[in-house]
Amino acid sequence: MPRVRVVENNSVRVRCIGIYCIKIQFYECLHMSPPAHLLSRTGVHLDVWQADALAGAPGRVVATGDALLDAQLPGGGWPLGALSEIMQPPGVHSEWRLLLPALARCGTGAVVLVGAPHLPFGPALGAQGLMPHRLLWVAAQGGAQSGAQRLWATEQALRCADVDAVLAWLGSVRPEQLRRLQMAAAEYAKLLFVLRPEQAQNESSPAALRLWAAPSGDASDTLEVRALKRRGPPMDQPLHLTARPARLVCLLAANHTWSGDALDRTAAHA
C-alpha cells in the first residue's frame, strides 16, 4: 500500500499518494470575508443579484438610442447574444421605432428579417442610419410548415458570420424552440429579436428580455412600452417614448418653422 504523506499550513493541504498529489485549497476560517474589491458599496458581493435592483447585463449590450429605455434595461441596452421578445397588439408594427437606432449602430453586417409582414422601405431606413444594402428579407410563405421554416431560417441566419442581427416574426412557438434560438444567439454573439402577438405574453419563454409595445391611447406620437420580463424589479409605470425618430422630429419642426415664416412673409406683402 502506498505511503500517504500530508503537509499542512494555514491555507493549503497537500496529500501525496505515491506519485499523485491532490492539492486542496481552503479558507483558514469559514467566516472569512471576501476581498474588498469584490464587494459593492452596500457590502454585497458583486456576483449576488438583488431582486429589487436592476441587474447588469451578463454580456455586452447595444444601446437602444433612447435614454429612457436604456435606463430600464439591464446593462443599459439590448443584450448581445441573447433573445429579446417584443409583443404587440394586432395590426401594430412599432418594432422599427424601438430597434432601428441599435440596428444602425450594431455593425456593418447584414440585418436579416425573417417573415417580416411588410417589405421595408429602404430609403426611410437609410435616412435613419440603416443602409439598405445591409437588409436581407426572408419571405415566409403561409401554410402548416411556415412556422418551422421561419425557425429554421432564423437559426441559420444566427449561425452566419456575416450577420449582425436577426429579426424574426413568429406566431405560435414552443419554449424549447425559442431556447434553441437563444442558444444559437449566445453561441454566435448576435442580436436576436423575436416579434410576437401580444397573447404570447402569457406563455413561458426563455427570453432574457420581454417587452410589450403599442401606440399610447391618448397620443399617436407616443409609444407605450412595458417590461414583461427583465432581470430586475417590475416596472412601476410604463414608459412613454416619442414614436417618431429624433431626426424626423427635428425635420418636421424645421419644416413647420419654415412654413410659418413663409406665411408671415406672404401676409406682409399682401
PLM regions and their residue ranges:
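Conserved catalytic network of the ASCE P-loop NTPase/AAA+ motor domain
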Residues: G76, R105-C106, G129-L130, Q156-C160, ...
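A short acidic, amphipathic alpha-helical/loop segment
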Residues: L98-A102, A124, A153, Q177-L181, ...
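Phosphate-binding/switch region of NTP-binding enzymes
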Residues: V194-D261, A267
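Long, charge-dense
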Residues: V112-V173
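A contiguous pocket-lining binding segment that forms or flanks enzyme active sites
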Residues: R159-E203, A214-S216
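Conserved RecA-like P-loop NTPase ATPase core
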Residues: L69, I86, L135, V166, ...
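Detector for small/aliphatic-rich hydrophobic stretches
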Residues: P2-L113, A127, R230-P233, L252-A270
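Short, well-ordered secondary-structure micro-motifs
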Residues: P123-L125, E155, L178-R180, S204-P206, ...
